[in-house]
Design a protein with these regions (language model features):
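Conserved small/polar residues in nucleotide/adenosyl-binding loops
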Residues: 356
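Extracytoplasmic
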Residues: 2-34, 273-278
Length: 356
């Protein structure tokens, strides 16, 4: 789980660099407004969603080890490519450096050109980032299925999924400071390079349980305990592991729709906060992410998501207390979690209250 945890942490760090730097550092240079940033994040989300439809097949086809390497390699390259958008924009519009870009009169035709050209370069880099990041969770879930029996997979998933929370926690503590000290370009490069470091460890550390020298016979037996089980009166075992299910057939399963409904209710809220909270705090209250108060507020916001570790334990608790099968226990837990984001509606009446 440690490698999966760190991969997911890097995944969310890379995803957060733009949201934590655009308003304070990037917008003045490229003359952006909310339209440009909103379009970039929307296209990223769409590409990410579409790529997720095929990422699982890609991981199955490449194998867990190679598939994960490809995924994190592509998204790390995409993350680093953001740093080149300034140079590309300068070359396109014929200006020598970032200072010249910022010196262009706001509202002029040249400023509009700079904004549009830079936006398209960022969209290109963002699409590559989305292409690679889409492979993280399918690969991590596949590794979890290889190393844990069904009853333990929810908890194992919550552990690596907590990497998203840790990434979101550390992002406001590090990224604005990097951008303030060395420029927003270095923030993308430094954070993006973490993925290449992870790849070096993955090459040497990952092996399937049956091939891993540190997995003994008793542990292997525990891992494989439910590879032979009875489902609807039929024995399901290793001989059926190679069976392929088409994408369209998955839409006929109630499990697919239950999972999609749960994600629909939670992910929209999470991504909205992820992309827009830093900008909102700056525009509404004048709180900059590179300052102490901004860091503290963002850190507090994301600290709450650490509860996801305990959330992954809930299905196991339900199984032990009620005797439900793993699927039913997970669906019950997911239903509970799906309604929790609705609590954010209670914050609306407090929107006009100042923190001072």
């Amino acid at each position: 789980c440690a490698m999966l945890f760190f991969a997911t942490t890097v995944n969310y760090l890379d995803r957060q660099v733009l949201s934590l730097t655009w308003d304070e550092f990037i917008k003045p240079e490229f003359h952006w407004n909310e339209y440009h940033y909103g379009l970039i994040t929307s296209i990223f989300s769409i590409v990410y969603a579409v790529c997720m439809l095929f990422a699982g097949r890609f991981i199955d086809w490449m194998g867990t080890k190679k598939g994960y390497l490809w995924a994190i390699g592509v998204w790390s390259m995409g993350a680093c490519m953001h740093a080149l958008c300034g140079i590309a924009t300068e070359a396109w519009v014929g200006l020598p450096d970032a200072a010249a870009l910022r010196a262009v009169e706001a509202g002029s035709a040249l400023a509009a050109t700079i904004a549009m050209v830079s936006m398209y370069f960022f969209i290109a880099a963002r699409c590559i980032l989305a292409l690679g990041e889409a492979g993280n969770f399918p690969a991590a879930i596949k590794v979890t299925a290889e190393y844990f029996p069904k009853k333990d997979r929810a908890y194992a998933t919550s552990i690596f999924n907590a990497g998203a929370s840790i990434g979101a926690l550390f992002a406001p503590l590090t990224i604005p400071l990097l951008a303030k000290a060395w420029g927003w370009e270095m923030a993308f490069i430094v954070i993006g390079a973490l993925g290449f470091v992870w790849m070096g460890f993955w090459v040497f550390m990952y092996k399937k349980p049956s091939d891993h020298p540190k997995v003994n016979a008793a542990e292997l037996e525990y891992i494989e305990q439910d590879q032979h089980e009875v489902v609807d009166g039929e024995t399901v075992g290793k001989e059926q592991e190679g069976e392929k299910i088409s994408f369209w057939r998955t839409l006929s399963f109630k499990q697919t729709w239950a999972f999609a409904f749960g994600k629909f209710m939670t992910d929209g809220v999470w991504w909205f906060f992820l992309f827009w909270t830093p900008s909102y705090l700056n525009s509404q209250f004048g709180i900059k992410m590179s300052e102490g108060l901004g860091v503290a507020l963002i850190f507090t916001l994301y600290a709450i998501t650490m509860l996801s570790i305990y959330g992954g334990k809930l299905p196991t608790i339900i199984i032990n207390k009620t005797g439900l099968n793993p699927y039913a226990a997970r669906m019950r837990a997911m239903l509970i979690f799906a309604f929790i984001p609705l609590l954010v509606l209670l914050a609306q009446p407090m929107g006009t209250v100042s923190y001072t």
